[in-house]
Amino acid sequence: EYPVVFVKGLFPGKG
C-alpha cells in the first residue's frame, strides 16, 4: 500500500 521507495527506506529488501 506504500510506495516502493518508502518501503525500501524503512524495510530494505522488503520492497
UniProtKB/Swiss-Prot annotation:
GO cellular component: extracellular region
Cellular location(s): Secreted, Cell wall
Main subcellular localisation: secreted
Keyword Secreted attributed: yes
Keywords, comma-separated and alphabetical: Cell wall, Secreted
Protein name: 26 kDa cell wall protein
